[in-house]
Swiss-Prot record:
Belongs to the cyanase family. The keyword Lyase applies. Keywords: Lyase. This is Cyanate hydratase. NCBIfam families: cynS. It comes from the Eukaryota. It comes from Oryza sativa subsp. indica. The active site is at R94, E97, S120.
């Protein structure tokens, strides 16, 4: 079983991401071909989810660069990690857990789809919906809908405080 973090884990993730890059496919394209969500594909390739044996053939077909040893490592239970400084109220704890656990993959997909930037938490919509699952049990749906904000190049001639000082 793979230990928590460390050089070995980072090396495996680098190899998995290299196989993805070789495929020249986005997380979404791989997901469509493999019958998985794009976030789950990213989770698998970042070693934050365990590849199930029945899913391996479809993923290998979508990402031909996945070697036997990489697939074997992906089938081991991963060391899932996120920032440990969390709030202890159960609902907030679980929401933080979900955001922290999937955050790195979501960030990579945002960068892949939009470029270098972030989702606004100001021009932002969030909804919590109750739906009934296929098994008849209640399900919680949390939707984050935020405006994309690209990072700015920090040009001195665009910095108003400097422009104001020069004209004074």
């Amino acid at each position: 079983m793979e230990g928590g973090g460390g050089e070995r884990a980072a090396g495996v993730v680098r190899r998995l991401m290299a196989a993805k890059a070789e495929s020249r496919k986005s997380f979404s394209e791989i997901g469509e071909e493999a019958g998985l969500t794009n976030v789950y594909v990213a989770q698998l390739l970042r070693r934050q989810a365990q590849l199930k044996p029945e899913t391996a053939p479809a993923l290998r077909a979508a990402v031909p660069g996945l070697t036997d040893d990489l697939v074997a490592l992906m089938m081991e239970p991963p060391f899932r990690s996120y920032h440990p400084d969390i709030v202890h109220e159960p609902a907030i704890y679980r929401l933080n857990e979900a955001v922290m656990h999937f955050g790195e993959s979501i960030k990579e997909i945002i960068n892949e789809e939009f470029g270098d930037g972030i989702m606004s938490a100001i021009d932002f919509y969030c909804s919590v919906d109750k739906v009934q699952g296929a098994d008849g049990k209640d399900r919680v749906v949390v939707t984050f809908d935020g405006k994309y904000l690209p990072y700015s190049e920090q040009r001195s001639d665009h910095m108003m405080s400097r422009l104001t000082r020069k004209t004074s």
